[in-house]
Amino acid sequence: TLLSKVPFYPQQEYFCGPTTLSEVAAYYGVDHSADSIAGLTFTPGLQGSPQIEMAAASRQLGFVAYEQRGSLSQLLQLIDEKIPVIVLQNNGLSWLPQWHYAVVIGYDLDRREIILHSGLTAEYRLPLATFEQTWQRANYWLLAMLPPERTSALLDPFLYTRACQDLLQTRQT
């Protein structure tokens, strides 16, 4: 399963957050460059984008920012529903983290791989076991950016309702 219509943009250094937001927004027909989004998310002192800023930027772009601690099963089911998902990974060690955002765009269960737009690589294939380790070290965080008219039965109703309320409070709809 592959969401081939999710565009890939090579990321600039430390811009994995804005780049993933730009890719998913473009998938839904909303074009914003990573540079323009970086003004909403990027924290120079951290050399990156905190999760709270990722969700806030999603709302500023007009999307429901559905965040949760996910599971591999849920992630694959969201892909089956043609919903690309932003994940946070720790590609370093627990005591020396290397945080990185990527967009999950597919999977191949026969080859036991997850497919990501990540960094400078489009359709990067990563063994599921490796992905689960890096995602686990980031507490299985996921962000599904959804247009306000889109939902999924896979999403926790309470968290989804809260995400919709957060969007309404930004007055972006």
Outline where the language-model segments fall:
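Active-site-adjacent structural segments surrounding the nucleophilic cysteine of cysteine proteases
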Residues: T1-G48, N91-G92, D110, D156-Q165
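Extracytoplasmic/secreted envelope proteins and their assembly/folding machinery
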Residues: E13, G17-A25, A34, A38, ...
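Active-site-adjacent substructure of cysteine-protease-like catalytic cores
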Residues: V64, Q68-H117
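Noncatalytic regulatory segments and standalone regulatory/sensor domains
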Residues: D108-T173
